């Protein structure tokens, strides 16, 4: 039980630290602003494109109205009225207007793309027109997912009714919620797959993040009536701006639910890196026992860890015992909670010396060079820690 509590605290502390480093609330606020700014041209764009694929445009309009009301409950009526007026007065729009609508809606895609880069600690430099092209491709993919979602939602009620007929003990409403949740999770996972800059993410991890976002949205949906009842007093302070204030808060919460799933994916994907980071910066008996028990290698006296000109595949962390390194005739002794072998890994060279166990026995942990380099490139505190140790080596 103590191990479970310690592990839970570790996960919570590092996940909270991630949210703080990424300025999660600022990301949510920025994305919410861009979403509000580009919502009308984006909805018009979706309506115009999907109307060409579906014979009955009223179905598209009603589905978009439902989606908009979930995001901006107090403003959805005015937004959809504006969409209706624009589309009624702009029959037969040419390619120029489609280009204008894409350009007006692209800041939302740009904001989402940058959020993914921030959360996954990636830096990709591209030219302006390349980024704009990618943003337009993202918008097209989002519109395609909207089309698939609307197409499937038309048949969800019939599917739930069929399932209820086959299995009478199942409640139709429960089955409908289940099918809707599964389809929503699949669409979110596909969107995550398209947007993520990390191409090595396992499919199961994408589904976990999508499920987390879906659960948050379901929870918000259940809390909607409570939030709306609490908002009655806002009119005292905001007057005629009350509806806008409520819609902005609700939009912010929904965006936070979406980005929460992405944060969870990035956290789980980098979990091993966080464990090794704690091993270097905050070593403890609990950490070694819970996370690194299977990683510990026991060595006897005079065993050689590496020799001159051997490949640099790992950095070594000493759990217990003493290790002596010899580089160009200079000997150095390493003890508990110290590490060695990082210079060859950093410089991408072969070993410049050898390392031998000098105590009766020693316990070490191998840190893969990819993990060490990732920590060195992404974590400022770890960079300072390594630089201080390198400075000590130079001075001595």
Q: What is the role of each PLM region?
A:
Residues 235-239, 334, 346-349, 380-384:
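Short, conserved loop/turn and helix-capping segments at secondary-structure boundaries
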Residues 365-368:
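NUDIX/MutT-family hydrolases
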Residues 351-352, 370-396:
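A small-molecule sensor/coupling module
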Residues 73, 360, 380-381:
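Proline-centered flexible-loop/turn and helix-kink motifs
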Residues 1-311, 316-317, 323:
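Membrane-embedded alpha-helices and immediately adjacent juxtamembrane helical segments
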Residues 297-299, 303-360, 372-374, 387:
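Cyclic nucleotide-binding regulatory domains
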